[in-house]
Amino acid sequence: MEFWQNIYVNFDVVAFEIFGLKVHWYGIMYVLALLVALMVAKYYAIKDNMGISKAMLDSYFIWVEIGVILGARIGYILIYDAHTLWYLTHPWQIFNPFYNGEFVGIRGMSYHGAVVGFLIATYAFCKKNKQNLWKYLDLVAISVPCGYIFGRIGNFLNQELFGRATEVPWGIYVDGILRHPSQLYEAFLEGFIVFIILLLIKKYKKYNGELIAYYTILYALARFVCEFFREPDFGIGFVAFGMSMGQILSLLMFLLGLFLSFYLRNIKKNL
């Protein structure tokens, strides 16, 4: 286990360089996450005869990607970053990929912010193209967990969002402290397990919007559990009742998922 525990010592976050531009493993995993999510969405759109063309789906994913990046970055600035006021007075710096003249990419993304950006982009796209909003949301619910796996692996390879101190033999050393590889826990629980459960639910789907409602509930539960192993966000720590910001937001997501499930099941059955 010694090699595994010291993997960060022996691993370079930069995969390769092109003309002096460093390409990080995180960036590669991010692209893989998008491609996998798109491929899974196309597969189920055809398999389930959803009436969504490949061209329409490609266009939709462009909208979603823009919404996700904007939402994730702005969400991080508003929720987690210690320099929120500075960014609000220097908004052009929010997406600045350079630091001291060196290209470092866009650092600091919030999943919950990404969700908001995704929802806004999806609503705008469906409104503009006269598409069924809930049908698209269900398609995303079944495809996103697959891409999410690669996203969290990217966090692990980028040596960020690491876990709390531990004594378990599979822990990894971060700055001399043995910690939970919580990014991999999240990839497994929030990605793989959520996907498997949604596949089972999908077999008995009764109405459009059911999958996105259950995804919201399942992700919130998985994230809440994983937060017990993840180091609280720097500068924020535990927010209330011994819970991290991620757990507080997950509770809100869980309640939203319950409301959405009740609303769609009892009020919007014919969507």
Curated annotation (Swiss-Prot):
Its main location: membrane. It is an enzyme of class 2 (transferase). Pathway: Protein modification; lipoprotein biosynthesis (diacylglyceryl transfer). It is found in: Cell inner membrane. Its EC number is 2.5.1.145. It is a multi-pass membrane protein. GO terms for molecular function: phosphatidylglycerol-prolipoprotein diacylglyceryl transferase activity. A 1,2-diacyl-sn-glycero-3-phospho-(1'-sn-glycerol) binds at R152. Catalyzes the transfer of the diacylglyceryl group from phosphatidylglycerol to the sulfhydryl group of the N-terminal cysteine of a prolipoprotein, the first step in the formation of mature lipoproteins. Belongs to the Lgt family. This is Phosphatidylglycerol--prolipoprotein diacylglyceryl transferase. The gene is lgt.
